[in-house]
């Protein structure tokens, strides 16, 4: 830890203009590569706004240990509350309906939802421990295993992931807004409103996000407790699963993939929200608060969806409302009607919480795709992120269930490979010691691994995804063996393949190149 506080972790070399000669794409924003013209004026404006509002004009720079302060214990609760606000939302509620779609009964769906949410939360908790210890954002952390060039692919995937997940939240929130207005506000308009409000909050920066998310969860926790109280009596725990045999196994595996993808997908942004904590903050505390901050709120939202979806078997009026849209079934299941509209109006805001995180982290990922991209002000990347979210949400707004099944599963696939590589690098090759990281060289290609081992393991992981995935548009050869519609085993197979492939590939890379 001493290295983090002083020597190698000091960050003194981060703005050193002396770069390796292999590094044309990568010149930092130093005197050798300053933005010019309009870009320079925009960066100047961003710096001015940073001084006034703290919008983080240097968001992707490493936060050095001496620049960070100890955070009071009550503010450290944000490690959990941030995620509580981002996950207790209508998207998780909608995901709770998928167990019924896969032919599972209520008991099976609840068990999978709770246990797999905990597993996914643990994955995020493990990733989060790198933030305070290194002072680096998640996409910068992964440079120490993926290397400079392969990590660009990871940054692109992460940006797409954040935009896609935010689009899901816009769709579910827009559906709720449409129901509240009795159809007077179209789904498209609702999507635009949610995306723009989230963008405005995200622009201000991490400090505003942490304050907003620290308290926003309370509203949605109360709403879901009311929902449990009013709908729990209709939960149908007697109707058996409609799927049997191999089809039941396939449904179980597919639901596991969706729930895991929903929870674990935050692993690729986790460190983004911990860089302001002091380097000596307890990593056990970080892990536990993050894990529970993901698992419990995710379970609350999804379990509420499980309960209401099971009640469709005994409440045909709810089934009719569900066919009209997600917001209508929420409104129909709560009473009195005026109170239901009020709660639904508040629940619309839950989509903003997820979007705030998605837009903020997507902009950070875009800035790390290449050095020229890093010179573009963060607020412009956030504007482009807003446009991407609107395009995805408006394009997929009529196919929510298919969007959820396909997109959330895909999130889990690549996040599994990512976290396995990050953790094996840390615990096998660096012996769990953050002092072994050349943190000053985080932005210098010649001081980073080449990423050959990670590329090989990640590439084999992609093959494993394709063999084990079960999507509406493609069913892999392994998945096809399980049930009529296939059973998604992509995460499990990807985990095994990546975990086995990375150590020997990385060993050979280190032996040949010495880093």
Where do the language-model regions lie?
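Membrane-water interface regions at transmembrane-helix termini and the short interhelical loops
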Residues: 100-103, 129, 153, 172-182, ...
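Transmembrane alpha-helical segments of multi-pass small-molecule transport proteins
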Residues: 155-158, 181-204, 218-228, 262-270, ...
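C-terminal membrane-solvent junction of multi-pass transporters and transport-like membrane proteins
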Residues: 419-501
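Juxtamembrane transmembrane-helix boundary signature
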Residues: 114-149, 153-161, 502-515
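Loop-to-transmembrane helix boundary motifs in multi-pass membrane proteins
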Residues: 188-193, 352, 356, 368-401, ...
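Membrane-interface "cap" regions at the ends of multi-pass membrane proteins
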Residues: 2-106, 250-256, 276-285
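Membrane-interface loop-to-helix entry segments
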Residues: 189, 193-194, 198-231, 244-247, ...
């Amino acid at each position: 830890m001493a290295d983090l506080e002083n020597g190698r972790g000091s960050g003194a070399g981060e703005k050193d203009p002396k770069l390796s000669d292999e590094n044309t794409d990568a010149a930092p924003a130093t005197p050798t590569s300053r933005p010019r013209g309009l870009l320079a004026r925009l960066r100047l404006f961003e710096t001015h706004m940073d001084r006034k509002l703290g919008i983080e004009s240097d968001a992707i720079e490493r936060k050095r240990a001496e620049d960070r302060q100890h955070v009071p214990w009550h503010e450290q609760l944000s490690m959990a509350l941030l995620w509580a606000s981002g996950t207790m939302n209508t998207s998780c509620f909608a995901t709770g309906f998928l167990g019924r779609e896969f032919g599972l009964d209520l008991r099976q769906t609840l068990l999978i939802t709770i246990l797999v949410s905990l597993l996914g939360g643990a994955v995020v908790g493990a990733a989060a421990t790198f933030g305070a210890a290194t002072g680096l954002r998640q996409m910068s952390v992964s440079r120490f295993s993926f290397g400079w060039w392969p990590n660009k692919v990871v940054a692109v995937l992460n940006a797409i992931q954040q935009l896609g997940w935010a689009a899901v939240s816009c769709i579910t929130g827009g559906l709720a807004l449409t129901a509240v207005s009795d159809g007077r506000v179209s789904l498209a308009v609702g999507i635009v409103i949610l995306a723009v409000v989230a963008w405005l909050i995200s622009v201000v920066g991490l400090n505003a996000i942490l304050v907003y998310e620290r308290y926003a969860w309370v509203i949605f926790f109360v709403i879901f407790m009311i929902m449990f109280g009013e709908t729990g009596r209709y939960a149908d725990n007697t109707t058996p699963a409609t799927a049997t045999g191999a089809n039941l196994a396939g449904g179980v595996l597919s639901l596991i993939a969706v729930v895991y993808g929903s929870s674990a997908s935050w692993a690729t942004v986790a460190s983004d929200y911990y860089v302001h904590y002091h380097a000596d903050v307890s990593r056990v505390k970080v892990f536990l608060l993050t894990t529970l901050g993901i698992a419990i709120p995710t379970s609350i939202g999804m379990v509420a969806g499980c309960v209401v979806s099971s009640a469709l078997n005994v409440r045909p009026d709810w089934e009719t409302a569900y066919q009209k849209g997600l917001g209508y079934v929420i409104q129909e299941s709560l009473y009195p009607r005026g109170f239901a509209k009020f709660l639904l109006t508040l629940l619309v805001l839950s989509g903003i919480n997820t979007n705030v995180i998605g837009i903020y982290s997507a902009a950070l990922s875009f800035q790390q795709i290449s050095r020229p991209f890093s010179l573009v002000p963060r607020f412009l990347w956030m504007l482009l992120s807003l446009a991407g979210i609107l395009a995805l949400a408006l394009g997929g707004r009529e196919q929510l269930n298919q969007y959820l099944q396909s997109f959330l599963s895909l999130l889990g696939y690549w996040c599994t490979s990512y976290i396995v590589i990050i953790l094996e690098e840390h615990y096998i090759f660096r012996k769990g010691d953050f002092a072994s990281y050349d943190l000053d060289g985080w932005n210098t290609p010649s001081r980073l691994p080449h990423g050959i081992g990670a590329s090989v393991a990640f590439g084999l992981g992609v093959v494993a995804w394709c063999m084990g995935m079960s999507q509406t548009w493609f069913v892999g050869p392994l998945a096809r063996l399980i049930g009529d519609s296939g059973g998604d085993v992509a995460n499990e197979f990807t985990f095994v393949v990546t975990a086995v492939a990375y150590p020997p590939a990385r060993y050979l890379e280190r032996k040949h190149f010495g880093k």
